[in-house]
Amino acid sequence: MSTPHHQFESKSSTAIRRRLSSSVSSKQRPNIMTTTFASLTPMWAGVAGTLVNNNTQYEIAVTVHDGVYSTDFASVIIPVTPGDTVKNSKDIEAQVLNLIRKFSAEHLCKFLGAGITLALLKECPNLCTRLWLDMDIVPIVFNIKPFHTDSVTRPNIKHRISSTTGSYVPSGSETPTVYVEASHLDDPSHLSPNAAQKLPIPRTLDEQSDSAARKCLMYFGPNNNPRLSIGARNQVTVDAGGKIHLIDDLEEYRETVGAGTWNAVIKLADELREKKVKIGFFSSTPQGGGVALMRHALIRFLTALDVDVAWYVPNPSPQVFRTTKNNHNILQGVAAPDLRLTQEAKDAFDAWILKNGLRWTAEGGPLAPGGVDVVFIDDPQMPGLIPLIKKVRPEVPIVYRSHIEIRSDLVHVAGSPQEEVWKYLWNNIQLADLFISHPVSKFVPSDVPTEKLALLGAATDWLDGLNKDLDPWDSQFYMGEFRSPCAKEKMHELNWPARDYIVQVARFDPSKGIPNVVDSYYKFRNLLRTRSPDMDESEHPQLLICGHGAVDDPDASIIYDQIMALVNSDPYKEYAHDIVVMRLPPSDELLNAMMANSRIALQLSTREGFEVKVSEALHTGKPVIACRTGGIPLQIQHGKSGYLTTPGDNDAVAGHLYDLYTDEALYRKMSDFARTHVSDEVGTVGNAAAWLYLAVMYSRGEKIKPNGAWINDLLREETGEPYKEGETKLPRTKLDMQG
């Protein structure tokens, strides 16, 4: 039984609550009215705790911060059971969540982040996990001491930060304790004196929680997103260098996969830990694209397993990124026919990668002697590193990972732009020990020796902001947040939840088939008019086309303008008021809410890599209508979890949309099947197993010759965890990888 020690004192406005609230019904639940709020106020919290009353009770303090000031405070005291740490932990957990939920509901706010004291986390190890998964709060842990500390710099300059990094102490470093005469304190009995018989100045629990809230706020940047953190030598310090604790409980990861996958991961991770193998990933961008999303999730999981892994990115260069994007489009066959890789662009590209590479091969760098033991290099931006590594450390195994489609039918056409780009890249890639491709036919040029070729799909994380289940309270916050950029750009708004919507989540890229999405929607609306004339137009679903871009993607604005021009032209402008086209700020939860609250998902790419966005949609129970391109057919079971169409066959897409929207039984059947038939291979844990396997095999000194095999098949065999009958996996159809 908890005892309120100090209650929240601020009062919410009933007038504002009334003005922001509305009661609506949805097409799925027409007879149930749901109260929603137009917007929720972003807030932050600080949480601290300590044992009191001779360790018989535990006091919890929560400070509320609005981004400028600490606005409120509450504390509660709960009894503790001596020796029962599990029960005590769960009781503390429940009280913290209850205090925050209560304040959220009463004040119409959404907590985005919470500073957690290390002392509290030690008593309640899974508190951060629960805050993240249950309340969508980013927990950031700080070692806030129960006594006052002072600056390590001289008092007269302690508020100045020198231009030299060595002159100031980074957050989390040890700072000296402030001591005073024992006689100056009212009740010094619980404090320990130092050698000079002086005592530290105590910091009360409310001061500790307030400090945690203020420190937490420092880690949030524009659009209230956690700041990206880049460390020395451009190492991506995932989760603010470990201060952000999203998933502390490995059991949460275990529950996302089957026993075979999990057992394999644990066996491989154990061997790498014992051998102290160091793994290094090198890719072009730390945020925004699919590769960056996978790497953040992978590093987070492997760090939780205590595997020694690091991820590095180069200094960004807009000039080089334009070149790499052109190369990407050329290799996929979606660039203008006259676009070429010039010698000037090659020279700038080579100089850029050499400059960055020399930082990593210099003494103490990840590629210098004593650095990483296995190197993984992502995509066509980084292969220039390979010859440099081979020169400095010829013994280090290098794995090249290709995430994109390489038109094997075009790269061997003499004089073609594709041949030109591929020859330039292959000159470096051929020095790698292994070439990993998506398991899609004709994705690999014939230059790549079959014995070096291995297959691995893309992945997504079921526990990150992009895919985790959002509480309805948090979901409505993000739907409300979506209205802000729509209003700012004078874009039409979604009328959700009163109306359903169809969604395609993808970058604004020439290969994503967005014109086909618009045309398919137009034809679908015409079908509703002709085949279901009794259905009111207000019951017709809207269309949402959205996505956010990568740092190295300069095409987005060009494609966005083309789509807006198309939507407002004949014949599509008739439905333009129901088409929402938005580039979103970089918020994973925002994309999550857009997908989770949709009715049907589309993915009408004309050229594609693997496109794991399809599995993300299926995981939420959304039937997906997509084109037979890239790795998409591997993820959808036609007629069971969605429909596969030929690129450009917009009449077929419209027909499938009509069937799914008007036949509730069909929709429910497909939705249930989609939700329960997603392979472990496309999740972080299954994907991590592949990287762990490669690191283990190379650490044993073995020369891997996969001969076009799936890495997941090799690792399951190696670890003695073969696939069992009925276990969901991507179809192992016969592939013609090199056309």
UniProtKB/Swiss-Prot annotation:
UniProt family annotation: Belongs to the glycosyltransferase group 1 family. Glycosyltransferase 4 subfamily.
Reported function: Reversibly catalyzes the synthesis and degradation of trehalose from glucose and alpha-D-glucose 1-phosphate. The equilibrium lies in the direction of trehalose synthesis.
Record key words, sorted: Carbohydrate metabolism, Glucose metabolism, Glycosyltransferase, Transferase
UniProt region (Disordered), positions on chain: 1-28
Entry EC no(s): 2.4.1.231
Enzyme class: transferase
Biological process annotations from GO: glucose 6-phosphate metabolic process; glucose metabolic process; trehalose metabolic process
Taxonomic source organism: Pleurotus pulmonarius (Indian oyster mushroom)
Catalytic activity: alpha,alpha-trehalose + phosphate = alpha-D-glucose + alpha-D-glucose 1-phosphate
Encoding gene per record: TP
The organism's taxonomic lineage, starting at the top: Eukaryota, Fungi, Dikarya, Basidiomycota, Agaricomycotina
Assembly and interaction partners: Homodimer.
Propeptide residue interval(s): 1-26
Name assigned to this protein: Trehalose phosphorylase
